[in-house]
Amino acid sequence: MLSVYSDDHRLHFGQSELVDGKLQPCFEMPSRADTVLARVKSQNLGEVIAPKDFGREPLLRLHDAAYLDFLQGAWARWTAEGHSGDLVSTTFPGRRLRRDGPIPTALMGELGYYSFDTEAPITAGTWQAIYSSAQVALTAQEHMRQGARSAFALCRPPGHHAGGDFMGGYCFLNNAAIATQAFLDQGARRVAILDVDYHHGNGTQDIFYRRDDVLFASIHGDPRVEYPYFLGYADERGEGAGEGCNHNYPLAHGSGWDLWSAALDDACVRIAGYAPDALVISLGVDTYKEDPISQFRLDSPDYLRMGERIARLGLPTLFIMEGGYAVEAIGINAVNVLQGYEGAAR
């Protein structure tokens, strides 16, 4: 299986995040991708290539131009005002505040407009890192368009919490959605996205919620007790043309392979019935039993079984890296999914 990777991910590294009332080093750190890359190489998964540059146009298919301009220029504006630390929002358009404009012109106001939490710090290298992460996804997608049955986009920062015009949860650009749209623009009639990250892919859901050319299925922690709290419930089935194309599987804290795999089986049945031309996997491995910010109980061998079950769908499959914060195990678990898939797909 071909993997696509860029060293540019190291340009983004937030100084700290607020966890349980305390500032601590960010869980979303460069060593995550470095560890996965090392495992890809040690297991001889296949060739590793650098991304091509497809420009901003594929990003603009889903992300607002003003939002991209903001992300690209925010750090320069921040430092021009005399600041040096991470740029993090502190004010958001909550209940009974205006959300439909006008967009504030002050930097902190505009940042709050485009953010839904404090977990997406902008640093000096953030734009280049997130831009390259999207190009990683697009390069892997192009490899599949040229005939490959699978590919792995080792994206960092992750993307599934990012919407068309908002960021949060470590995410700025939605890599999985961008690659999905590229499949459609190049002739696919339908594409399915299966999000196996511990946290609900609220950004991906929002982007495709009213469309019938993308089926979205997500297996995640119950939002009643788990981030992102305000989306990811089972009754969210899509709207308008997209009604019936959104499937959420919220699971309780402590869920292990038995409950998780039952949800996977149901999601796979729905995906098979949808008959997509391609499948995109938002590959988060923060479902691992020792992940520091998650509450599921999957073990490393379970990720082999996950890949095997996905392979039985018999679909061209693009894997896009999302979460996973147990750094010592992230490479083993992510590559186990890929090896499980490859072993069953032969």
UniProtKB/Swiss-Prot annotation:
Keyword Metal-binding among record annotations: yes
CDD domains for this protein: HDAC_classII_APAH
Domain of life: Bacteria
Pathway the protein contributes to: Amine and polyamine metabolism
EC number(s) reported in the record: 3.5.1.-, 3.5.1.62
Record note on cofactor: Binds 1 zinc ion per subunit.
Induction: By exogenous acetylputrescine and agmatine, but not by putrescine.
Subunit: Homodimer.
Protein's UniProt name: Acetylpolyamine amidohydrolase 1
Organism: Pseudomonas aeruginosa (strain ATCC 15692 / DSM 22644 / CIP 104116 / JCM 14847 / LMG 12228 / 1C / PRS 101 / PAO1)
Highest classification ranks of the organism: Bacteria, Pseudomonadati, Pseudomonadota, Gammaproteobacteria, Pseudomonadales
Gene that encodes it: aphA
